[in-house]
């Protein structure tokens, strides 16, 4: 726990992250002690900083379930949504994770409209909406390149209807005009 190296099968292994070990030990030694909620929350932050989003989300969920009266419970809800958003922004855009993140951010804003984090949550909702519009537009482009024009139109119309004032709606409208000229 103090940065000591561990051995496995005779091989010395470095400590991955001392903070994770420390926070885990605090929680194990005093699950309902006064430092446990902060340790659980900070464990989630440490995991999130290492891009271990699912584990971080689990840690934040434990803050909410084990310490519902903690002032960190509110921040944990925001962090859960943030983890979902991070997963959705990965190299393989995950529409399901993006939808979950958007719903969790919206729920956070509904439950905590005056919280400082609500402004950031609203900003994240807008970013997720934009990312979804971009993804839908790109699917339309894919179908257009495959000469599946009717399918492309469906996706372009979806972008226009869901996000009429976005740059992606403008692009989709332009593509629709080009498809109409093809006829």
What is each of the regions a protein language model found here?
Residues 1-183:
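Acidic, polar-rich low-complexity tracts and alpha-helical solenoid repeat scaffolds
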């Amino acid at each position: 726990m103090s940065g000591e190296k561990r051995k496995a099968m005779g091989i010395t292994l470095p400590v991955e992250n001392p903070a994770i070990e420390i926070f885990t030990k605090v929680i194990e030694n005093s699950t309902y002690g006064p430092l446990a909620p902060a340790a659980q929350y900070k464990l989630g932050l440490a995991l999130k900083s290492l891009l271990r989003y699912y584990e971080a989300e689990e840690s934040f969920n434990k803050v909410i379930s084990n310490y519902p009266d903690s002032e960190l419970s509110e921040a944990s809800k925001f962090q859960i949504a943030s983890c979902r958003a991070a997963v959705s922004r990965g190299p393989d855009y995950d529409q399901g994770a993006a939808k979950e993140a958007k719903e969790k951010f919206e729920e956070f804003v509904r439950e905590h409209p005056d919280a400082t984090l609500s402004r950031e949550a609203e900003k994240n909702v807008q970013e997720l909406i934009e990312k979804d519009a971009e993804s839908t537009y790109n699917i339309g482009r894919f179908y257009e390149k495959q000469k599946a024009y009717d399918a492309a139109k469906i996706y372009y119309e979806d972008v226009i209807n869901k996000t009429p004032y976005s740059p992606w709606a403008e692009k989709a409208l332009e593509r629709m005009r080009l498809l109409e000229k093809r006829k």
